């Protein structure tokens, strides 16, 4: 049996989970169709998902249709969970991108489609909610061609809420023959030579074009009234093809981890090549660590079943493997989809338990959530000792807060969400602290040179000290101290885009230790940074704004107020497209503002594009309870020279 892995993607409230539930029901995988409003869906299994009607974690289920097993990955639709969506892209054979016929193309829709297009993932576009009042499909078709792709093939006509095929294996409209000829040289040559071309020839060519992500079929339906679902199933099993297996050697990718109510760890793997068998002893990540498969499940027709073997391109579930982490692979390293640029969160907030004695419980709970979602980054502020969580947005914060309370029984309070800034030295400086020169209490001399690098370069560390003079353990201690120092600069933000050179060293044998060098390094670094001064860097977003021509003046005024850098403006009689860069801090809520002042017609799409020197205000990230006395003494001694 052929097996395919299909992603279901959509903007929030496009009906993604409802479509998935209908696919399960129509294929016979479930006896009734789950409803988001009733909280009885298969894919949204978490209590918080059922209650709020949104998908938080990617979930996997399975159906069989036309002799093809289709593993369906239902992904979050909210931008705050984009990291969860990005992880699923690596394992997809194809995707269904769902649009709402009423709301049309949203910023998230375009972002998802651009990624699918970039990664060349075969994609079917499904227009849901065609039953809604006020739907204008002709305008939506124009929007699809203008904002997604010209290479779309509308497979059906919609008449009075019903769908009728206009392109199939036995029939194809004349204008679609021309479309296929324009996309395939072989068919074009046969057409120009007046050779006979059957509807099946055109159909098979369309299948090949979709498989190469050169053409995107468009279907219609309504999940609420089960319209167009069977046709969508037929399209999925026709257009999304299974990959060819290249080896019999086991290769698998761990894409999801969850914990059941009893705390058992459940790991989901896609078997890329070969097979995984019960009682196999397999290697993790080509390391020296081996594990034995003591239990093995797969998903069949919406249900998990115990099996002895899971074959290529199928999903395996293994329980109670403590060493597993998302991104691990078993066996040979798999060839996965490349080209994803992971988006790092640019917001943060401090979190504290309502009861201070439950702090360790919060840390343990956050660690469990991190195992399930590696994009969840939390740390302890070295100055304030507060727990800090990096965030993608407000919705993610609310979900984390609810999970901590309901799943781990600990109530927490989040402080104000802040933008994550960074720091960079302004100029090249050199600083030395000498051994046995007060107030230096360490048996070490360290000299460091700091110099700024171009934005986006990151941290570079070099050493001018010979390993013949100062061995690896001492120098590694200095490098560790530098990395630790870069975690918090003069304003408490990460220091980046700089080169730090270890320029001078002295030690006394046998009293000097690596610990002396490790502990002295942050003081040398801090004094050098104070001498240099820092530029504050703020996160920037690349934006594309599409609004009706009548709203262009307001849009440009808004962008100027947000201190954006407009790179391109193109307008016609109806629409205006504006591209450029804008600070995240000034544009956090602008997508909803655009939707409001354009009555839902405008689209504000953004993606991270690095950091640049801030033009406006910024906030510090330091909450020092007491001053570092030794640093104060170093500063005083330096100022007296």
UniProtKB/Swiss-Prot annotation:
Entry's transmembrane regions: none
PROSITE patterns with a match to the protein in the record: G_TR_1, G_TR_2
Gene Ontology molecular function, alphabetical: GTP binding; GTPase activity
Binding site for GTP: 10-17, 74-78, 128-131
GO biological process: response to antibiotic; ribosome disassembly; translation
tr-type G domain ranges (all copies): 1-244
Protein name (Swiss-Prot/TrEMBL): Tetracycline resistance protein TetQ
Taxonomy of the source species: Bacteria, Pseudomonadati, Bacteroidota, Bacteroidia, Bacteroidales
């Amino acid at each position: 049996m052929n097996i395919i892995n299909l992603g279901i993607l959509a903007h929030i409230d496009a009906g993604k989970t409802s479509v998935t539930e209908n696919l399960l029901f129509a294929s016979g995988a479930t006896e009734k169709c789950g409803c988001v409003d009733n909280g009885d869906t298969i894919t949204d299994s978490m209590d918080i998902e059922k209650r709020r009607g949104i998908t938080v974690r990617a979930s996997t289920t399975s159906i069989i249709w036309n002799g093809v097993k289709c593993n369906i990955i239902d992904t979050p639709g909210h931008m705050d969970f984009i990291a969860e969506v990005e992880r699923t892209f690596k394992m997809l054979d194809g995707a269904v991108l769902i649009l709402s016929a009423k709301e049309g193309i949203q910023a998230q829709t375009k972002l998802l489609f651009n990624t699918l297009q970039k990664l060349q993932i075969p994609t079917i576009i499904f227009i849901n909610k065609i039953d809604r009042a006020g739907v204008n499909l002709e305008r939506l078709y124009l929007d699809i061609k203008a904002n997604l792709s010209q290479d779309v093939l509308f497979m059906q006509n919609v008449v009075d809420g019903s769908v009728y095929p206009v392109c199939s294996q036995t029939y194809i409209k004349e204008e679609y023959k021309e479309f296929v000829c324009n996309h395939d040289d072989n068919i074009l040559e046969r057409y120009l030579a007046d050779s006979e071309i059957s509807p099946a020839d055109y159909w098979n060519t369309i299948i090949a074009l979709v498989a190469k992500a050169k053409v995107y079929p468009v279907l219609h339906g309504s999940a609420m009234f089960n319209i167009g679902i069977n046709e969508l199933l037929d399209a999925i099993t026709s257009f999304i093809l299974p990959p060819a297996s290249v080896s019999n050697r086991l290769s698998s990718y761990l894409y999801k981890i969850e914990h059941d109510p009893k705390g058992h760890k459940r790991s989901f793997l896609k078997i890329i090549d070969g097979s995984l068998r019960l009682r196999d002893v397999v290697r993790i990540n080509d390391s020296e660590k081996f594990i034995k498969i003591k239990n093995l499940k797969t998903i069949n027709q919406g249900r998990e079943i115990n099996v002895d073997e899971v074959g290529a391109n199928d999903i395996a579930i293994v329980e109670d493997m403590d060493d597993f982490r998302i991104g691990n692979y078993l066996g040979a390293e798999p060839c996965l989809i490349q080209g994803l640029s992971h988006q790092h969160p640019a917001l943060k907030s401090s979190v504290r338990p309502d009861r201070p004695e439950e702090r360790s419980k919060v840390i343990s709970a956050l660690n469990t959530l991190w195992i399930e979602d590696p994009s969840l980054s939390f740390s302890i502020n070295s100055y304030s000792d507060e727990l800090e969580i990096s965030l993608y947005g407000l919705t993610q914060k609310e979900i984390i807060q609810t999970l901590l309370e309901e799943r781990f029984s600990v109530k927490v309070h989040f402080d104000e969400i802040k933008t994550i800034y960074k720091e960079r030295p302004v100029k090249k400086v050199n600083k030395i602290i000498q051994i046995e020169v007060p107030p230096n209490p360490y048996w070490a001399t360290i000299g460091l040179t700091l110099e700024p690098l171009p934005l986006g370069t990151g941290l570079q560390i070099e050493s001018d000290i010979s390993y013949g003079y100062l061995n690896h353990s001492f120098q590694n201690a200095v490098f560790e101290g530098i990395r630790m120092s870069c975690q918090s600069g003069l304003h408490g933000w990460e220091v980046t885009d700089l080169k730090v050179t270890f320029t001078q060293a002295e030690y006394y044998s046998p009293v000097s230790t690596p610990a002396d060098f490790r502990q002295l390094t942050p003081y040398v670094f801090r004094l050098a940074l104070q001498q240099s001064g820092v530029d504050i860097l703020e996160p920037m977003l690349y934006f594309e704004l599409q609004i009706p021509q009548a709203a262009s003046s307001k849009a440009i005024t808004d962008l100027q107020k947000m201190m954006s850098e407009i790179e391109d403006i193109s307008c016609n009689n109806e629409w205006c497209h504006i591209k450029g860069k804008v600070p995240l801090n000034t544009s956090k809520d602008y997508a909803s503002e655009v939707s409001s002042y354009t009555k839902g017609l405008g689209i504000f799409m953004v993606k991270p594009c690095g950091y640049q020197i801030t033009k406006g205000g910024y906030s510090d990230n330091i909450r020092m309870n007491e001053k570092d006395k030794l640093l104060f003494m170093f500063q005083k001694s330096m100022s007296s020279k």
